[in-house]
């Protein structure tokens, strides 16, 4: 099962592809692992989703807070593991997906709980606020809408950079916070573009419910996060020296490349 076949990719040259060819190569090659990790991520996000839905249906802000706290405990590690799978794909790290997933969960769950709670609280309040706009007898003012959208964009920009750092590095929360701010300033246009892309994606998913629910198991979380991480990866690697640091710390994760002729020759020798 593969929604992104690699039939139009060029012959292997022993080097990484670039641009759209690289994008479709990774999407096709690692679709099965993305599909599996996506299901686990949806499972981790489900307590938060059901909790927010319940609080909105009951119009209770008091129900929203514990729902976001409990949901964040599961959502934080799940999102960090999703980004871990994506960044392993981006740097061509070897290993079976389930072994890598278990390793990422053990390494990241403690560091991801508090950010997960904060993220879910903020996102939950934004979701509840959106419904108050819908319930209100009058439309909100343009200024209110602008502040709402700006806050949502900044939230998306910040956590688009924060989750990958949990997956990639062992750092303090303060260091990650500083890295996010500095990266957003230096690469503001690219970070803003990726945040807007994610918001447009999720807006479309929400507007076209329940039909888009069919897509959730196949492309729900991983597809847009993979796209955003793919676009940000060159800048993040330049800023944080991702591949250099990981290769030094974990030599076994260094990728191995060979052209098609070398691969065929090696396979023939084995046979």
Model feature map: region roles:
Residues 1-131, 135, 141-144, 148, ...:
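Helix-coil boundary and N-terminal low-complexity module in membrane systems
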């Amino acid at each position: 099962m593969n929604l992104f076949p690699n039939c139009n990719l060029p012959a292997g040259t022993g080097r990484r592809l670039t641009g759209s060819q690289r994008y479709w190569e990774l999407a096709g090659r690692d679709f099965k692992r993305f599909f599996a990790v996506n299901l686990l991520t949806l499972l981790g996000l489900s307590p938060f989703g059901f909790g927010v839905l319940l609080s909105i249906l009951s119009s209770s802000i008091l129900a929203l807070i514990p729902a976001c706290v409990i949901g964040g405990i599961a959502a934080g590690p799940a999102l960090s593991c999703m980004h871990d799978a994506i960044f392993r794909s981006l740097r061509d790290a070897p290993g079976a997906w389930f072994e890598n997933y278990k390793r990422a969960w053990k390494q990241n769950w403690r560091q991801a709980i508090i950010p997960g709670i904060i993220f879910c609280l903020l996102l939950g309040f934004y979701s509840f606020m959106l419904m108050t706009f819908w319930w209100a007898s009058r439309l909100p003012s343009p200024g209110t809408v602008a502040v709402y959208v700006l806050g949502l964009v900044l939230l998306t920009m910040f956590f688009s950079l924060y989750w990958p750092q949990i997956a990639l590095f062992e750092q303090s929360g303060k260091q990650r916070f500083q890295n996010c701010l500095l990266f957003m300033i230096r690469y503001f246009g690219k970070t803003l573009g990726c945040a807007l892309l994610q918001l447009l994606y999720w807006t479309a998913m929400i507007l076209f419910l329940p039909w888009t629910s069919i897509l959730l198991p196949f492309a729900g979380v991983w597809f847009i996060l993979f796209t955003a991480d793919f676009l940000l990866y060159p800048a993040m690697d330049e800023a944080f020296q991702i591949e250099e640091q990981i290769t030094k710390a974990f030599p076994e994760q260094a990728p191995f490349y060979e052209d098609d002729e070398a691969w065929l020759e090696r396979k023939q020798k084995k046979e």
